[in-house]
Regions:
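Short amphipathic alpha-helix that is part of the acyltransferase structural core
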Residues: 1-30
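Membrane-anchoring hydrophobic segments
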Residues: 20-24, 40-43, 86
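Elongated scaffolding segments in large macromolecular assemblies
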Residues: 32-34
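A short helix-loop-beta-strand connector motif used in the catalytic cores of GNAT acetyltransferases and
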Residues: 36-48
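Short glycine-aromatic motifs
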Residues: 43-44, 122-128
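Conserved donor-binding loop and adjoining core beta-sheet/short helix segment
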Residues: 46, 50-84
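Acyl-donor binding region in acyl/amide transferases
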Residues: 70-125
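Conserved catalytic-core motifs of GNAT/GCN5-like acyltransferases
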Residues: 110, 128-139
Length: 139
């Protein structure tokens, strides 16, 4: 069962899931800070799912504005236990419902995962790659 999470202790369990994500650029501290700020700003929404007392998925949404000032809902962090593949669809549907509730025009996410993996997992929900980010790392 998926529920909205407002328990700061539970946020620590969610940040622990970052350890299971290969090549995650989001740090535990940053993710935790986002979730805590959501308790006060109503711009971050954290959802969690449990089966038999064990976390099997989580979703962190961030409400922001894009470059032209339109509201955008960002999938900041999604983790789903490999034994529950259908849970991703439920989380995407929650994000869609939240976007409709907030009258948001776009849902987006940033990932450094392989394009083929992302296409296979999210194209069926209507997500499309709309741009590429080119960056220079400054050391």
């Amino acid at each position: 069962m998926i529920t909205l999470c407002k328990d700061s202790n539970e946020f620590l369990n969610i940040t622990d899931k970052l350890k299971e994500v290969k090549g995650a650029r989001l740090t535990q501290k940053i993710l935790y800070n986002y979730m805590i700020s959501g308790l006060y700003t109503d711009k971050v929404f954290t959802f969690v799912s449990y089966n038999k007392g064990r976390m099997n998925g989580c979703l962190v949404l961030f409400l922001t504005k894009d470059q032209i000032g339109e509201l955008k809902l960002v999938l900041l962090f999604v983790w789903v236990d490999a034994h529950y593949p259908k849970l991703l669809e439920e989380f995407i549907n929650i994000a869609i419902k939240k976007a409709q509730e907030l009258r948001v025009k776009k849902i987006s996410f940033i990932t450094n995962r392989n394009k083929k993996v992302i296409d296979r997992r999210v194209n069926k929900f209507g997500f499309n790659k709309t741009c590429s980010i080119w960056e220079k790392e400054m050391i």
